[in-house]
Amino acid sequence: MHSIAIFGGTFDPVHNGHIKTSLAIQANFGFDSYYFLPCKSPAIKPPSFASSEQRVEMLKLALKPYPDFKIDTRELDRDTPSYMVYTLQSFRQEYTDSSLTLIIGYDGLLTLPQWYQWEKIISLANLLVINREEFFQQPVPKSVQTLLNQYRNDDKNILLNHHAGSICLYNAGHYDISSTKIREQLKQHKDVKNNLPDLVYDYIKKQGLYQ
């Protein structure tokens, strides 16, 4: 069965934590296809944020050394509101016989009940939840715990060979980097070069982003 990983985020900007996490996931799971899925930014956003086009360009630059990582822009291309359930339905229509796995952080798991039509997500894809080991001990909403009790399975072979319906918790390592922190540091003219791919850093400086 063809296995597809979908790593969604605003990537504003994409940073070394995103890349290292993805490399760790691929080293352990070996998905046949791995997509970075840039999400739409909120309609009302600070002017210091990058445009959709700039975020995609930074992703292209960051992923140049990794040809197996692809970019999927279907959320950005959609004129209507972009909900993950719609995105997964679109993937499922395109890849009817493939295993789909949505990669989210543990914070995403905790807020899952706030997602639009969140109950449908597990029927459309598997969930790969990434974060540090200690965060796995945090209390979860009752509805999420019920979901974990029913669908959790940390066997990667189950994840790779089932169309949907499994939740795997995985420690991909700890990288103390966030796009929010990088934007704040750039605004304060602090050095962030070590946290960004070189080509992305050069692009940000050339475009004058996040000032």
Swiss-Prot record:
Lineage top rank: taxon: Bacteria
EC assignment: 2.7.7.18
Pfam families in alphabetical order: CTP_transf_like (PF01467)
Keyword Nucleotide-binding appears in the UniProt entry: yes
Pathway annotation: Cofactor biosynthesis; NAD(+) biosynthesis; deamido-NAD(+) from nicotinate D-ribonucleotide: step 1/1
Gene3D superfamilies attached to this UniProt entry: HUPs
GO function terms (MF aspect): ATP binding; nicotinate-nucleotide adenylyltransferase activity
Gene Ontology terms: biological process: NAD biosynthetic process
Catalytic reactions of this protein: nicotinate beta-D-ribonucleotide + ATP + H(+) = deamido-NAD(+) + diphosphate
Record-stated family: Belongs to the NadD family.
Known function: Catalyzes the reversible adenylation of nicotinate mononucleotide (NaMN) to nicotinic acid adenine dinucleotide (NaAD).
PANTHER family for this protein: NICOTINATE-NUCLEOTIDE ADENYLYLTRANSFERASE-RELATED, PHOSPHOPANTETHEINE ADENYLYLTRANSFERASE
Name of the protein this chain belongs to: Probable nicotinate-nucleotide adenylyltransferase
Gene transcribed to yield this protein: nadD
